């Protein structure tokens, strides 16, 4: 490269005036100047730009060095570093020089506690006042809002899982738990207990009791003997031993509820789906298959302490055997809703009888 530069800069003849022997100093100076120019040109020519691959490799090396430095900086602290951290933490918890706990003095803590005490005390006082005012407007005896109370729901006894009564007449173990459930449920309806606690009311009319809402109300008698063949007094097995089961139905209590138009609510049972002849005979007790008006209205559990919910017993005396029979019992009366699709207990109840022999 140097030879090429010299050949470009040198004249065509071999000997130049710069190398004349008659002026050696000037020749040397010119020679040095030429050498410097040649070196600069050679440096400019010989500097080759780096390729992209080389630049990427250098960048990767720099990144690796930076990562190593960061890892070294984030490594496990030495014993002195741990000791310094413990000292800082202990000083934060308690600084004996400035007598500070958690970076606060005793006066600062006292002010904070005092502020929070008054804040929460005021909050509790406001809540207490609101609750007291609310309870002044609510009667514990009669519900304030009853417009959206649903019509009476119904429930049956004895209790059966998924409302499926499945038993074998010849195997007492399959129906004995139904008998035990009915006996336990009817203990509060014993004649002696009803005569002692409740009064004998005339049938066919409401038992309305005037007076203050906090006065105790009397309740009408509903004796166990009213259920006759389904009372468990004549047949201790409630018909389950003969394949003629008894099922009791009651309405849920609603404060102030009265059957409309003075007509008692009646009960009617039939096959829900399938052959209607699967149930050929049903006996009801009381014989009217209704809830007498004398048990209404209901005044609430605080004043109507001895109130006994009236019952209607369904005695399935002739039901097809050895197959599942879906049964639907509905309430019939003015203002009673019994066709709610999404609630199977409003005004009706659906259960299954499967009596095996």
UniProtKB/Swiss-Prot annotation:
Example of a GO cellular component annotation carried by this entry: nuclear envelope
A molecular function GO annotation: inorganic cation transmembrane transporter activity
Record localization: Nucleus inner membrane
UniProt main location, coarse: nucleus
Topology relative to the membrane: Single-pass type II membrane protein
Membrane spanning stretches: 111-131
Acidic residues bias: start-end ranges: 52-73
Alphabetized Pfam families for the sequence: Na_K-ATPase
Parts of the chain on the Nuclear side: 1-110
Coiled coil: none
Subunit architecture: Associates with a SMAD7-transcriptional complex. Interacts with SNW1 and TOR1AIP1. According to PubMed:17592128, does not associate with known Na,K-ATPase alpha-subunits.
Function field: May act as a transcriptional coregulator during muscle development through its interaction with SNW1. Has lost its ancestral function as a Na,K-ATPase beta-subunit.
NCBIfam families: Na_K_ATPase_bet
Name of the protein: Protein ATP1B4
């Amino acid at each position: 490269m140097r030879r090429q530069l010299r050949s470009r800069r040198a004249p065509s003849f071999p000997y130049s005036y710069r190398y004349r022997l008659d002026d050696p100093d000037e020749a040397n100076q010119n020679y040095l100047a030429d050498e410097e120019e040649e070196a600069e040109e050679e440096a400019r020519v010989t500097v080759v730009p780096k390729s992209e691959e080389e630049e990427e490799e250098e960048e990767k090396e720099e990144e690796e060095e930076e990562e190593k430095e960061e890892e070294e900086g984030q490594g496990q602290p030495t014993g002195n570093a741990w000791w310094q951290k413990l000292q800082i933490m202990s000083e934060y918890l308690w600084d004996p020089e400035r007598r500070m706990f958690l970076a606060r003095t005793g006066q600062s803590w006292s002010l904070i506690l005092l502020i929070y005490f008054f804040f929460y005390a005021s909050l509790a006082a406001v809540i207490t006042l609101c609750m007291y005012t609310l309870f002044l407007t609510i009667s514990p005896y009669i519900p304030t809002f009853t417009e959206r109370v649903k019509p009476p729901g119904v429930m049956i006894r004895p209790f059966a899982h998924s409302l499926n009564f499945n038993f074998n007449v010849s195997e007492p173990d399959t129906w004995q738990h139904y008998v035990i459930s009915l006996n336990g449920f009817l203990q509060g309806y014993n004649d002696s207990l009803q005569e002692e606690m409740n009064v004998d009311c005339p049938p066919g009319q409401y038992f309305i009791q005037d007076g203050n809402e906090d006065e105790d109300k009397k309740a009408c008698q509903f004796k166990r003997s009213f259920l006759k063949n389904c009372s468990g007094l004549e047949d201790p097995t409630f018909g389950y031993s003969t394949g003629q089961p008894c099922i009791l139905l009651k309405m849920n209590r609603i404060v102030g509820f009265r059957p409309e138009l003075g007509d008692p609510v009646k009960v009617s049972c039939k096959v829900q789906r399938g052959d209607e002849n699967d149930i050929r005979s049903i006996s009801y007790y009381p014989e009217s298959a209704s809830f007498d008006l004398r048990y209404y209205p209901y005044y609430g559990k605080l004043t109507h302490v001895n109130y006994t919910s009236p019952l209607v017993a369904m005695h399935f005396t002739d039901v097809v055997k050895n197959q599942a029979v879906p049964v639907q019992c509905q309430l019939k009366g003015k203002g009673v809703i019994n066709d709610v699709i999404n609630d199977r207990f409003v005004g009706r109840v659906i259960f299954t009888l499967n009596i095996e022999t």
